[in-house]
Amino acid sequence: MFYQDPFDVIIIGGGHAGTEAAMTAARMGQQTLLLTHNIDTLGQMSCNPAIGGIGKGHLVKEVDALGGLMAKAIDQAGIQFRILNASKGPAVRATRAQADRVLYRQAVRTALENQPNLMIFQQAVEDLIVENDRVVGAVTQMGLKFRAKAVVLTVGTFLDGKIHIGLDNYSGGRAGDPPSIPLSRRLRELPLRVSRLKTGTPPRIDARTIDFSVLAQQHGDNPMPVFSFMGNASQHPQQVPCYITHTNEKTHDVIRNNLDRSPMYAGVIEGIGPRYCPSIEDKVMRFADRNQHQIFLEPEGLTSNEIYPNGISTSLPFDVQMQIVRSMQGMENAKIVRPGYAIEYDFFDPRDLKPTLESKFIHGLFFAGQINGTTGYEEAAAQGLLAGLNAARLSADKEGWAPARSQAYLGVLVDDLCTLGTKEPYRMFTSRAEYRLMLREDNADLRLTEMGRELGLVDDERWARFNEKLENIERERQRLKSTWVTPSAESADEVNAHLTTPLSREASGEDLLRRPEMTYAQLTSLAAFAPALEDEQAAEQVEIQVKYEGYIARQQDEIEKQLRNENTLLPATLDYRQVSGLSNEVIAKLNDHKPASIGQASRISGVTPAAISILLVWLKKQGMLRRSA
């Protein structure tokens, strides 16, 4: 039977991608249905209890700048906040927070249940309704059919998921949850390339059985950072420390002596695991010269005794896991409350997607999260927001939108996936971005909030706060530009006390702030340049914009040159065999990838600059050279 009301957008899956997709589509005024196998696990942190980190924190800030949910949720649930790379330049600084799993899930569910235009329904999905290469709905486990103009798949590790502990394995979407086997079979019937990936998680430890007195503590930062541009530290719950222990030679001997019982090394697992989050058995074998590995003992929440030992993800048998855990300092009497495991699951080649995350082959079908080959809550949330946005726009008969590589880490993520694909779980790093000086955490709102407003994602409150911040930045920069001090002025002595070389000529506030030794806080503590801005976000922008002005201008020039290629469009139906002068290898790769632009084509492995030149000349001769606005 069909449900009585049709929807504009259906989201299948209630993890980090699905919840962002649902919130986004509903926020844009589209009637949205979120289908989940269990309402109680909406926003569940399946693996580590943390949000953010290098590259990942940048994505969270971008999601927030576009009106998304993740930053607000972690501000309400974070039990330890830190700035990573704090001593380095602003481009690579990143926020990270330990999370209370229960509080995080509560924050997400509360937001979903209070979002207008959004209905949540608990039922596993087993089939899609596809008519003439267009998705028009979904079918649940009990045969109930829902109609919609667009469907977003955010199914995580559930597609034909298989859990491995030692040489034993069983079907599961994650520990304690069933897999989605009928939907996996249905998707394999569609003209989509599918493969398998693997990820893993460590055993969870009972905190009452750990001797914390012999371990080093790691505290959060003070003052506490916040994730959301709309947030403040008063929203944070109680803050707690993490603890540090290490593996040792005894640990490594246990692992080496039991490799024959590892499903990875015994050849039972076929899926490829994450390169940058390897299992402890992988670390011991790949880095044989290391006699120890640092392990962070992270609390799972304020009301839980569970500890997440970050760094010992494993699929070894339970008895071996016990030996590994008890070989480490402070853990000699530790008890495991949940065994670690590896999970294999289906993912679909993201090269079969448009940059909007819509399938190239099934109109109206969008993919986001681990189904696209990524790993991590933050990568999933960013894709979920983009897929939800474009599903909503499609249902409203509007053109899709995707950010450029020069505009956002989300743009880098999507371009990497859609252009290059992935053979292993993809995670974000700052090193993946060519323009990382422009793509900082601190300016995510300056880069994206105006566009978010145009797209209908940014509410009036955020928009007013954003414009106030812009005005504060502009007013303060003008004030510093027009405030001068001369070497002979009474205030010069106070200024010189903060400089490595004294003033030799008249200088403005901006001139002084450009000096490496002068901070904004120091400058505005001087009588001549007081008072400081009360808006801390605006003050940070003033300092960064002034100090890095030359570098930022140079990078902006590079971006403008590159945009010429990015905006030169390639016809979706072009058969590259028609283009004389291209090698067979280049023709095969271009026909396989079907790049949307010259810029995207230039990033495909094996497509040379010479091939790009040939292609541009051919397009011009054919009168097919056109650029997007």
Swiss-Prot record:
NAD-binding protein involved in the addition of a carboxymethylaminomethyl (cmnm) group at the wobble position (U34) of certain tRNAs, forming tRNA-cmnm(5)s(2)U34. InterPro entries: FAD/NAD-bd_sf, GIDA_C_N, MnmG, MnmG-rel, MnmG-rel_CS, MnmG_C, MnmG_C_subdom, MnmG_C_subdom_sf. Its cofactor is FAD. One of its GO terms (molecular function) is flavin adenine dinucleotide binding. FAD binds at G13, G14, G15, H16, A17, G18, V125, S180, Q370. GO terms for cellular component: cytosol. Homodimer. Heterotetramer of two MnmE and two MnmG subunits. NAD(+) binds at residues 273-287. Belongs to the MnmG family. NCBIfam families: mnmG_gidA (TIGR00136). PANTHER family: GLUCOSE INHIBITED DIVISION PROTEIN A (PTHR11806), PROTEIN MTO1 HOMOLOG, MITOCHONDRIAL (PTHR11806:SF0). Keywords: Cytoplasm, FAD, Flavoprotein, NAD, tRNA processing. It comes from the Bacteria. Pfam families: GIDA, GIDA_C_1st, SAM_GIDA_C. This is tRNA uridine 5-carboxymethylaminomethyl modification enzyme MnmG.
